[in-house]
Regions:
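Short Gly/Thr/Asp-enriched flexible loops that form oxyanion-binding sites at enzyme active sites
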Residues: 85-110
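Short connector loops at secondary-structure junctions
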Residues: 15-31, 122-131
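Short beta-strand segments
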Residues: 18, 81-85
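Extended non-globular C-terminal regions
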Residues: 191-275
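Short catalytic helix/loop segments, enriched in acidic residues and glycine
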Residues: 1-16
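Charged, often glycine-rich, active-site loop that binds/positions anionic groups
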Residues: 28-46
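Divalent-metal-activated hydrolytic enzyme cores
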Residues: 43-67, 101-193, 203, 207
C-alpha cells in the first residue's frame, strides 16, 4: 500500500496493524459479520460479531481492536489507512457484496471515528488526484493539530493559512468560522481557540471533489500568475479535458513553483519537504 506514494512513502512512518489478525483469528480466517445494528453497537454491548460458521467472536475482535488502538496511540499515530467494506475497519460500509453498505461503521472504524483519527480509504490511494487530495489534507491536519495558538494573532494567522483549503472543502462552515473570527471580542480565549482548531481539523478530514480541485487550482494559478508574472503552460482550465495523471502533475507543479517563489498555494498550504 505504501508503495503507491512512490518516493514520498519515506515521508511517513508506517505502523501496520490489523485488529482481526491481532484478535487471534489468524490468516486465512473465516469471514466475519456484524449481527445487530452496527459496529458501534458492538462496542456498546448491543450487537455481536460472528464468523461464517456462526461462532461468536465478539470478545476476540474487541481484544484485537483495543490492542490496535493501543499500538497506534503508543506510536503517536493520528492518521489511519483503512479498508472500506471490512466489518472491523470499515467506516462507511462493512461489506463488499454488490452495492450494499452493510452495517457501518465497523467495530474498529467506530473507535477510530470516536478518537478523531484522520481516516484514508485504501482504495482512494490508487487515484493520483485522490491521493494528492488526501496527502495535502493530511499535512494540513497534522500542522493544525500541533501548531501553537497562544494569542489572537496566532489564531488569525492559523486561519489565514488554512482558510482557502477549508473553503474548498466546506464553504458554508468555513464562512461561518470567518464571520465568528471577525466578530471576536477583545482579548484571547484559549478554549474558543481550541474549539476552532478542532472545527478546522474536522473539515480537513473530509475529501474534496475533482470539480472543486480543478476550479481551485485554476483560481490559485491565476492569482499566482498575476502576482509573479510567471506562466505555467501545463496548468489547464477546469473545463479542459485531460486525464488524472495530468491533473496530478499540474497540482504538484503548482505546489513546487509556489514553494520556490514563496507564494502561498491556498489549496495545499502546508508542504512537507522531508525529514
Amino acid at each position: 500500500m505504501s508503495e503507491r506514494f512512490g518516493r514520498e512513502q519515506t515521508s511517513f512512518s508506517w505502523h501496520p496493524v490489523c485488529p482481526e489478525s491481532l484478535s487471534g483469528m489468524g490468516i486465512p480466517r473465516s469471514p466475519i459479520r456484524v449481527i445487530g445494528e452496527s459496529g458501534r453497537a458492538v462496542l456498546e454491548g448491543n450487537a455481536k460479531i460472528k464468523n461464517r460458521e456462526g461462532k461468536d467472536v465478539t470478545a476476540m475482535l474487541l481484544q484485537g481492536c483495543n490492542a490496535s488502538i493501543e499500538a497506534l496511540e503508543r506510536a503517536n499515530v493520528f492518521a489511519f489507512v483503512y479498508m472500506e467494506g471490512s466489518p472491523s475497519c470499515g467506516v462507511y460500509r462493512t461489506t463488499l457484496k454488490n452495492n450494499r453498505m452493510g452495517k457501518p461503521p465497523g467495530v474498529f472504524g467506530a473507535m477510530l471515528l470516536d478518537r478523531d483519527f484522520f481516516l484514508i480509504p485504501a482504495n482512494d490511494l490508487q487515484s493520483p488526484v485522490r491521493r494528492w487530495d488526501w496527502k495535502r489534507r493530511l499535512y494540513a491536519f497534522a500542522w493544525a493539530k500541533e501548531v501553537d495558538i497562544n494569542s489572537k494573532d496566532d489564531l488569525f494567522q492559523f486561519w489565514h493559512i488554512v482558510k482557502f483549503l477549508c473553503q474548498e472543502i466546506d464553504e458554508k462552515t468555513a464562512r461561518e468560522i470567518g464571520k465568528r473570527l471577525a466578530e471576536l471580542p477583545k482579548g484571547f480565549d484559549k478554549e474558543s481557540a481550541e474549539t476552532l482548531r478542532h472545527e478546522v481539523m474536522m473539515i480537513l478530514r473530509q475529501p474534496s471533489s475533482l470539480e472543486k480541485i480543478k476550479n481551485r487550482l485554476w483560481k490559485h494559478y491565476m492569482y499566482f500568475k498575476r502576482k509573479t508574472g510567471v506562466e505555467l503552460e501545463n496548468v489547464m482550465e477546469p473545463t479542459d479535458m485531460r486525464n488524472m495523471n495530468h491533473i496530478a502533475d499540474e497540482l504538484m507543479l503548482m505546489e513546487k513553483t509556489s514553494f520556490s517563489t514563496e507564494v502561498l498555494f491556498g489549496a495545499a498550504p502546508i508542504l512537507y519537504r522531508g525529514r
